[in-house]
Swiss-Prot record:
GO terms for molecular function: structural constituent of ribosome. Pfam families: Ribosomal_L34. PROSITE patterns: RIBOSOMAL_L34. Disulfide bonds: none annotated. One of its GO terms (biological process) is translation. It comes from Campylobacter concisus (strain 13826). This is Large ribosomal subunit protein bL34.
Length: 44
């Protein structure tokens, strides 16, 4: 049986990337929340 997670960098970046997060107000909210929490990685 084929596994469900077949990772690919490009689609991942396009849907959860930093630049995509910065596009919208809510996306920036996500980044700021993760900064406040002290996350090592802010976006995918």
């Amino acid at each position: 049986m084929k596994r469900t997670y077949q990772p690919h960098k490009t689609p991942k970046k396009r849907t959860h990337g930093f630049r995509l997060r910065m596009k919208t107000k809510n996306g920036r909210k996500v980044i700021n929340a993760r900064r406040a929490k002290g996350r090592k990685r802010l976006a995918a």
